[in-house]
């Protein structure tokens, strides 16, 4: 069974794979995990913040050398690694 953080990191990897953006995202902040419970195959709510770098993915430049754009992501992940349930959406964080 995956830990909550591992499941979210997989979600960020999947987000990068499926993203139409030219740049990579990195996990910035992970909100509190749900209470430990029942079936690892049941989708769990998650909330986390990723930052998009301004560096293109093909350069493979270390993201920490790049400036960032920030997005807030919410959705669900499944902690059972054999079930690929992922429902994530991300929006630009509006500066106040």
UniProtKB/Swiss-Prot annotation:
Keyword Disulfide bond: yes
SUPFAM superfamilies: Cystatin/monellin
Alphabetized GO MF terms: lipopolysaccharide binding
One CC-aspect GO term: extracellular space
Modified residues (Pyrrolidone carboxylic acid): 1
Region (Disordered): 31-50
PROSITE patterns according to UniProt: CATHELICIDINS_1, CATHELICIDINS_2
Keyword Nuclease: no
Gene Ontology annotations of biological process type: antimicrobial humoral immune response mediated by antimicrobial peptide; defense response to Gram-negative bacterium; defense response to Gram-positive bacterium; innate immune response
Subcellular location: Secreted
Family: Belongs to the cathelicidin family.
Task performed by this protein: Probably a microbicidal peptide.
Protein name: Cathelin
Organism: Sus scrofa (Pig)
């Amino acid at each position: 069974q995956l830990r909550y953080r591992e499941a979210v990191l997989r979600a960020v990897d999947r987000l990068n794979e499926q993203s139409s953006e030219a740049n990579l995202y990195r996990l910035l902040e992970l909100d509190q995990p749900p209470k430990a419970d029942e079936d690892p195959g049941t989708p769990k709510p998650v909330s986390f913040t990723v930052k998009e770098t301004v560096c293109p993915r093909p350069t493979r430049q270390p993201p920490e050398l790049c400036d960032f754009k920030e997005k807030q992501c919410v959705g669900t992940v499944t902690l059972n690694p054999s079930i690929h349930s992922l429902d994530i959406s991300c929006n630009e964080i509006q500066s106040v």
